[in-house]
Structure formats: structure tokens, C-alpha cells
Amino acid sequence: MDDLASAAKGQVAQRDGQAGFNDAGWQIVAGNYERFVTQIDAEATSKGLWRVNGPLTAASHPYDRFARSFDHATGKVAMHFDVHDDLLRSHVGPVRLSVTYLDRGTGTFALRYDAAGDSEKTAFTVTKTETNAWKTESIDVTDWAFQNQGPRGADLQLVSLDAEDDIFHGVEVVKQPAEAMPAP
């Protein structure tokens, strides 16, 4: 908290007149920033992080402010996500799945999704290379089902494949035009 006085004044006062950054406040919507992709039981399955790379400065990456991570010490080794049922009404065409993560350490994680015939299909596996940069991994998939058949009723899962506490900024789902997929 950089400006305690502004934090007690509410959202508009914080936006218009605070000095520095406040990562908490009063009368602020609880939970993750989300739209159509909701983390299932976020507090029980992951750890919230703030100011990931230290104090925020003009040189800080925008993703440094808020993130979520695995926490092996407390058994939080998989995050589960529900894609809102009305987001993708037509099950035709490709969907791009993207994960933004901090490339810190050399650990490995996977993104899994609810596919036709496989509710825990691996979309991709990432092995980090210790650049300490924010990176985004994406893949277009055509066999997605998103029928809430994964663990905890999930459509998407981030799963730790080792003992590192991987750090994530976001998960994104974007419907692609049919021509976005390369020909077989």
C-alpha cells in the first residue's frame, strides 16, 4: 500500500487522486480480474501475488502488479477454469488458448483442456528457461468441447509437473476464424 489515505476513500478517489499504487482497498470487487473465464475456487487452488518483481516503478512490467502461482507447500498444484457457457455457443472452428507466465526457474507446467473424447487433453507443456521475462504460450485447438468435464467441473487446467511454484498472469480463450488454422 503506497497511499493508505486514498485506500479508505473508495475506488473513484483512488483512481483520481492517489499517490502510488494500492493493491487493496475498500468497496472493491473481490476475486480475479476476469471476463468469461473464471478460476474455480481460486483461494483453495492457488496463491495470489502482488508486486511480483519487487516495488513498482516506471520500468516495471504491467504484469508485475498482480499474479497467481502454484504453492506446493500447501498442496496448490493445479488451477481450474470454467469458460462461460455462452462465450462459445457454436462448437465450430478453432479456439486459441493462451497462458501468460513468468519465465522464472526451469520448471514445467501444462495447460489441459476439455476436448471431445478427452476431458484432460494436454494443449501444451512449457519448460521455463529462466529469462525472468513475462511470456505467452498459445495454441489453436479444434477439438475443444468445454462441457465442464474436467476436474472440479473445469474446461481448462494449469497443472504443475514438478516442484516449482510457477507464476501466471492470465489465461485467455479467443474464438478464431475458420481460416486461422493451417491446412493439414
Show the residue positions of the predicted features.
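Short beta-strand/loop motifs in extracellular/secreted proteins, especially
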Residues: 77-79, 95, 105-110, 164-169
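Glycan-recognition and processing domains
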Residues: 2-88, 117, 172-174, 184
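Extracellular beta-strand ligand-recognition surfaces/modules
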Residues: 138-171
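Solvent-exposed strand-to-loop "edge" motifs in beta-rich extracellular domains
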Residues: 86, 100-105, 144
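Short, surface-exposed beta-strand/strand-loop-strand elements in extracellular ectodomains
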Residues: 107-120
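Extended extracellular/luminal ectodomain segments enriched in beta-structured repeat modules
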Residues: 88-98
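Extracellular carbohydrate recognition and processing domains
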Residues: 118-150
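Residue-level recognition of well-ordered beta-strand positions that form the cores
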Residues: 82, 98-100, 112, 140, ...
